[in-house]
């Protein structure tokens, strides 16, 4: 899987909102009496019906999702609007509020936790309130697919911010009221019910939405946090030494005790495989839509391509080491693989990666062209030197890099220089 340098909890902390000090107005609720002196003016998307309050709420929610998601004032604005609609609905005995209302309300409550990551009690309160809201929605709208998406998002964020963020290398599973792998299983089970519900309804439009795709990214973030857990703490002993090699060695040496809450997840391929399988299914569901988003499809294909490239790293390294490193002369295996086995596995994985990277190609984004060229070069390296297969791959990669370099005024010159003799 493609890994990130920052997991969800750190990214949330890094994107602390800037406090708004001026008196402003939330345009979605012009009649609302607010005791807060901090208000915000929001320009809603053009397609939003200004005369429909639920449509306005959806517009506020969409505005937040399309932003940097670093403005607590906007999240509070969504919550205040939900509170107003709820009070108004209760007092005037209107028709029950729709499922999407409960979904937006619950997600906004959970989002507040990302602005208070240092206050664990508040984080817990926000998630309790969010899950209560989504369950209320499900009571009134059983198996509603939007509510199931919201519940999955909230559960995954809760795992990251409430359960993983406070952990240290010394943490013990006995300190937690629930095991994290069981919480993760429960969250993923809810997402599987989203897939099942879409299949039952023969309506796959829920997957034509970046908010649904965020679920797979949230899982990827969690797995990334687990994979790298503790590494940032290594070397924080007050020493002024800054030796890159020592730092690399320290990062590689981090191991979790069997009693650590993250041990089971870190030492299992189960969740990586789940991510891969359900990302494939996501793509399948997108392709069932006649007018599905090309941007979303490219993004899913890019992620799949990167995941196969990452999986190829170990066998690729084994092959190049056994074949070209004189220090390993006479050694038959590394990582349980012979040279031939490593070569075959690497070729298969990078070929799969190339297929998805080509589907992810965007004519308006040269970076996507370069991803294809780099994968071609890696695949070429797995063939015999000067073989036809290698030369063909190198030539095609060179053409792609030259084109990308030309349209970006030399941005990829280094990649070209590395390829050309």
From Swiss-Prot:
<dbReference type="GO" id="GO:0006417">
    <property type="term" value="P:regulation of translation"/>
</dbReference>
<protein>
    <recommendedName>
        <fullName>Enhancer of translation termination 1</fullName>
    </recommendedName>
</protein>
<keyword id="KW-0539">Nucleus</keyword>
<dbReference type="GO" id="GO:0005634">
    <property type="term" value="C:nucleus"/>
</dbReference>
<comment type="function">
    <text>Required for correct translation termination and probably involved in regulation of hypoxic gene expression.</text>
</comment>
<feature type="region of interest" description="Disordered">
    <location>
        <begin position="230"/>
        <end position="259"/>
    </location>
</feature>
<feature type="region of interest" description="Disordered">
    <location>
        <begin position="1"/>
        <end position="41"/>
    </location>
</feature>
<comment type="similarity">
    <text>Belongs to the ETT1 family.</text>
</comment>
<keyword id="KW-0805">Transcription regulation</keyword>
<dbReference type="GO" id="GO:2000640">
    <property type="term" value="P:positive regulation of SREBP signaling pathway"/>
</dbReference>
<feature type="compositionally biased region" description="Acidic residues">
    <location>
        <begin position="235"/>
        <end position="252"/>
    </location>
</feature>
<keyword id="KW-0804">Transcription</keyword>
<dbReference type="Pfam" id="PF12753">
    <property type="entry name" value="Nro1"/>
</dbReference>
<keyword id="KW-0810">Translation regulation</keyword>
<dbReference type="InterPro" id="IPR024318">
    <property type="entry name" value="Nro1/ETT1"/>
</dbReference>
């Amino acid at each position: 899987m493609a890994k990130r340098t920052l997991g969800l909890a750190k990214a949330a902390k890094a994107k602390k909102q800037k406090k708004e000090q001026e008196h402003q107005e939330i345009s979605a609720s012009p009649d609302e009496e607010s005791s807060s002196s901090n208000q915000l003016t929001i320009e809603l998307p053009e397609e939003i019906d200004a005369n429909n309050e639920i449509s306005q709420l959806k517009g506020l929610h969409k505005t937040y999702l399309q932003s940097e998601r670093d403005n607590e004032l906007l999240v509070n604005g969504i919550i205040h609007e939900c509170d107003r609609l709820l009070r108004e609905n209760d007092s005037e005995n209107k028709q029950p509020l729709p499922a999407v209302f409960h979904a937006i309300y619950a997600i906004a409550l959970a989002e507040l936790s990302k602005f208070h990551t240092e206050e664990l009690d508040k984080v817990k309160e926000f998630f309790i309130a969010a899950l209560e809201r989504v369950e209320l929605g499900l009571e009134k709208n059983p198996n509603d697919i939007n509510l199931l998406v919201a519940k999955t998002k909230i559960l995954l964020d809760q795992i990251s911010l409430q359960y993983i963020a406070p952990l240290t290398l010394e943490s013990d599973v006995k300190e937690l009221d629930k095991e994290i792998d069981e919480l993760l299983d429960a969250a993923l089970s809810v997402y599987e019910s989203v897939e099942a519900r879409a299949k039952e309804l023969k309506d796959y439009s829920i997957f034509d939405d970046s908010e649904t795709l965020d679920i797979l990214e949230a899982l990827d973030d969690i797995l990334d946090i687990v994979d790298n857990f503790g590494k940032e703490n290594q070397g924080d002993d007050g020493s002024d030494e800054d030796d890159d090699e020592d730092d690399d060695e320290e990062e590689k040496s981090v191991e979790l005790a069997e009693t650590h809450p993250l041990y089971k997840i870190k030492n299992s391929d189960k969740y990586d495989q789940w991510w891969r399988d359900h990302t494939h299914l996501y793509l399948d569901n997108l392709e069932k839509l006649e007018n599905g988003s090309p941007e979303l499809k490219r993004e899913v294909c890019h992620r799949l391509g990167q995941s196969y490239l990452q999986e190829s790293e170990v066998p690729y390294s084994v092959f190049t080491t056994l074949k070209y490193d004189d220090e390993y002369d006479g050694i038959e295996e590394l990582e349980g693989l012979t040279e031939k086995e490593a070569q075959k596995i690497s070729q298969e994985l990078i070929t799969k990666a190339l297929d998805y990277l080509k589907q992810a190609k965007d004519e308006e984004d040269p970076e996507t062209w370069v991803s294809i060229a780099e994968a071609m070069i890696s695949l070429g390296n797995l063939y015999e030197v000067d073989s036809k297969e290698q030369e063909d791959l190198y030539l095609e990669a060179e053409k792609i890099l030259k084109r990308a370099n030309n349209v970006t005024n030399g941005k990829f010159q280094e990649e070209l220089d590395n390829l050309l003799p």
